[in-house]
Amino acid sequence: GGSLLFIPDLPCPMNEAKKAAGEQAVELVRTGMRVGLGTGSTTAYALRAIGRRIRESSLHVMGVPTSFASERLARECGIPLTTLDEIDELDLALDGADEVSPDLDLIKGRGGAHTREKVVAAQARRFVVLTDPSKDVERLGAKRVLPVEVLPMATGPVLRTLTGLGANASLRMGREKDG
């Protein structure tokens, strides 16, 4: 099952809310767990907190990163890594979101790691989304565009299909962000 870890409006800067969400999420991590390590600024706080617990206590976990950026950060934090080829499932996956609706529907993937994030989330017994008040929207897609990750060989058909559905689709190459 999934859950949403939301830190309500706090009388502090947004980075403090993100840090609070990340550190609260790490309380779910137990020794022996295999943990999906998500992507984004809020999840980065969780990865740093996991690394701190590994260094300062007897926490032993294995992480599966959802992006090149989270893999790099996990290594810097001293989190041992594995892959989904090497293990069957994850006990927990922690990840962020780009937008959250009042019904707790999400948009993810603007960082360019959508497919990896989805695969890791699907392999987790529990999927926890870390968010802060800046991600709240009344309607998904109201603030920014909806990301759709497409294989290079499918770019033409997908663009034609989206345009046929009335979307104003454009291509952004995966050379930026976290992917």
Go through the PLM ranges and name each one.
Residues 15-19, 68-179:
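Conserved phosphate- and dinucleotide-binding cores of soluble alpha/beta proteins
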Residues 6-92:
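N-terminal glycine-/serine-/threonine-rich phosphate-binding loop
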Residues 1-2:
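Residue-identity detector for glycine
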